[in-house]
């Protein structure tokens, strides 16, 4: 049985892993689903001052408090930025890194910077305009959630996702990732899981980049961006087998 830490994406919270975590626990795995500062049940802590570093520390703190090691660490979407930083800070404790339809950053990358790399210029401009535009319009420094329909989330789940998602600090997308701990060298396996049922997706870029790369394995699930919501049993089976 494995120690599995599931890290959500932007504007979501630990709530989004509900069904996936339930299936994994039923199979005997230890599962943690930390929520980032400022979203989910921690939305009352929301602030434009929250950064990527804040969220990295959130997850590091969870792992240290739960005294977990030999971890399968899975990050969804923006969570790919977070788990990369977490693995860097915890040398020897993360066994497998899973990028679930997620960004795969290198040192110095920001999420918004990666959009320019992963998407056609006009599509990247639309995403960036939405993120920066809503933060500016609200005079709060907070981005509004993208509607679930844009990610092709199953109609039965869209209202639940839209109801639960909240605004998130733009700074989390603008701050570059700073790697300093050397922990990534100790990760034994990296898995990329592409959600192959929606577009325009920046994540096809990463799946193509790492398919066949040494130390990587690429899987595809035919569904929306929110795999953990729409295909929890399939995702749990994949994670539980790692």
Predicted regions and their residues:
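Conserved HGGG/HGGXW glycine-rich cap/lid loop of the alpha/beta-hydrolase fold
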Residues: 2-43
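Active-site nucleophile elbow and catalytic-triad environment of alpha/beta-hydrolase enzymes
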Residues: 163-182, 198
